[in-house]
């Protein structure tokens, strides 16, 4: 798949997002992205839209290692996600 081809031609981090398609609903994409040979790493996230969201967050985490402003925004984002989950939990339990 494309992520593996890209990873074979660069020294930059590559994030693979398996796309849900076909009779296996993306499982074939997941396996081909995960099973790369030694020396050709691909960071692989979940199949579909949740994987795409996690890929974006992972990319920001990588970039934030060298950018304090981005690191703070990421921290704020994660705190906000936690607060949203707590609000949803409170609604479910009330």
Spans of features found by a protein language model:
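Glycine-rich phosphate-binding loop
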Residues: 1-18, 22
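C-terminal binding/interaction regions
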Residues: 27-94
């Amino acid at each position: 798949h494309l992520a593996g081809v890209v990873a074979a031609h660069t020294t930059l981090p590559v994030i693979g997002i398996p796309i849900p398609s076909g009779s296996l609903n993306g499982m074939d994409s997941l396996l081909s992205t995960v099973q790369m040979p030694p020396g050709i790493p691909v960071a692989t996230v979940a199949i579909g839209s949740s994987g795409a969201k996690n890929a974006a967050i992972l990319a920001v985490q990588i970039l934030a290692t060298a950018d304090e402003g981005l690191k703070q925004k990421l921290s704020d984002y994660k705190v906000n996600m936690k607060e949203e989950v707590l609000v949803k939990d409170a609604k479910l339990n009330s």
